[in-house]
Amino acid sequence: MSVLDLARAELRGIRPYVPGAYEPGMIRLNANESPWRSPGDTSDRGLNVYPPPRPTVLQVKLAEYYGIEQKQILVTRGSSEAIDVLIRGFCAAGKDKILICPPTFDMYRLYASIQNAGIVRVPLLAARDFALDVDDILKALDANTKIVFVCSPNNPTGQSMARPDIERICRETAGRALVVIDEAYHEYATGGHYLDLRNRYEHVVLLRTLSKFVSLAGVRCGLIVGAPQLIEFAQVVLPPYTFPTPSIELVEQALSQDSLRVSEERVATIKRERERLAAALRDVPQVMKVFPSDANFIMVKTRDGQAFRETARRAGILVRTFEDPLLADCVRITIGRPTDNDQLLRAVAGVERASNA
């Protein structure tokens, strides 16, 4: 069975859009573009011409960086667009479903709702630091469950999922559903990644992003990593020309050796600060528990989440609370610069001293 047998039947025969030919050095009179640059255009390639249908130069660089083949990569506008592309490609509206494990990244639910796809929820096991409930995940699958989303490290709880659990899900869903492993935070993890699974299981897809690691959240660059035939199919769903020229050039710069060296040093700093902040928060009376984290944030259980959030806000710091009952009084704290983290700790400690005076 091919992974494409899981895709929407009505999309399988559609051919991708074929753009006009582009040859460097040739005069472009075949694409109805302006022959002049816009005033203030300082880009290398020129913003008066369309970007390439696919940012091939980035696919080459990313494939080299991750040690995979170019045909296994599709660049998207952030990993959120990748989620949308996969749901639209595999879930027929009003018929098919996705499976998610809340509390988790809410974009899975949002894009499924927009597509009118069903949503099966198998909650993480809160008593086990939000581990996957693999038995219930497998029991919940039926013929219309087309995608299983697993976020590792998980947002917003922060922990990496146990590799044996993920491998079991991949093994037992073969031929039944696509497994999408969202690795948006994998650079901050200590337990490795799941790139090796793409060759062992045709139905396994990985999501990556450059928003965190190389500090390009404003550029919106994500990618789908999967079997070549799945990537070819996803290109039917993703329109051409979606990745802008300025974004291509910024990502190229970020993937240079010098820039990557800086990014890797910053990741090391975040990891050190994560441990320091976690240790300090354990001594704060408001904090009941600091959850283990493999991401660039920490989640804590507090006595009063709203009060903790307002304490931080009065000190000029924004932290995140959640409406999900599973996360009652939990607060997600992004790891900032050392001075940012110090400011948060001073604010929380100061309020505690005042309340205990």
What residues fall within each predicted segment?
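PLP-dependent aminotransferase class I/II
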Residues: 203-283, 289-290
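PLP-dependent aminotransferase-like
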Residues: 72, 89-150
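Phosphate-binding glycine-rich loop
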Residues: 55-97, 115, 302
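N-terminal "arm"/small-domain region of PLP-dependent enzymes with the aminotransferase-like
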Residues: 1-64
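Conserved PLP-binding catalytic core of the aspartate aminotransferase-like
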Residues: 270-271, 281-315, 331
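PLP-dependent enzyme catalytic core of the Aspartate aminotransferase-like
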Residues: 164, 311-315, 320, 324-357
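Active-site pre-lysine segment of PLP-dependent enzymes
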Residues: 113, 131-144, 156-216
